[in-house]
Amino acid sequence: MKQNQAMDFLELKHQKPEYANWVSMWIPLSGSLVTLLFAGAAALCAKSSALAAGLLTVAAIVAFAFTFYMLRARTALSYAGGGVQGKVLEDVLKTLDQAGFNGHGKLLDIGCGSGAMSIKAAKKYPRALITAMDYWGAGWDYSQRLCEHNAQVEKVASRITFRKGDAAKLDFMADTFDAAVSNFVFHEVRSQKDKHALVLEALRVLKPGGCFAFQDIFFAKSHYGDINAFVEALRPYVSEIHFVDTPRNSCPPRSFWGRWA
């Protein structure tokens, strides 16, 4: 028994967490395939139609540029590359500190992906219990099993519970959590087009005075309309709310934080 436990410990010690990239590998792979298809079609049309060959060549160049850009973005975001993902998540937790979270109690991570934010929170707040939920839908490189693996490797599995769910209808009673965080999730929730209602659902599960820090593409009017009006519409429901406006090309992107009433 002890020998088996020792072997398990050694295996974990040599394992590394696998934090999936926000840019799915399917995107550059698909781009590469499209590039090859356009290039091949251009070669076939070269003798029969110079115009068609030219247009297909332009399309191949555009597809290649897109693929190259997405590969660069994937490298910059990855923990093994530029590490941008980790920096963004750290900023969310710093914002939660700014909101007044003292590191005690229950914290909810909405849309946990591969568990990176949840694990960072567990390490930063050793006295907190973390609940992390995600839909883990098709098209993403995430899964509950991956999250649990990462938490075990990072030695925080005893304080994190991962569960499948829908951010539009959280499976928790009101006044359950002392804090809530979310990063790049709300705009992806297709089950609720009304993002005001979606944010209110996230706030519903907070205890009175609970802290929150939400980060997303809040500059996207297609999702949030006028963000200042959006925040003002939330103000009656919270005791404190602040919108952090940053340039679109900066990192981290825009976020807001505060306390539930």
Please report, for each region that a protein language model flagged, where it lies by residue.
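Conserved SAM-binding loop of SAM-dependent methyltransferases across substrates and taxa
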Residues: S114-P126
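Helix-to-beta-strand junctions that scaffold the AdoMet/dcAdoMet cofactor pocket
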Residues: Y125, V189-R190, L206-P208
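Conserved beta-strand signature within the Rossmann-like core of class I S-adenosyl-L-methionine
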Residues: G209-D216
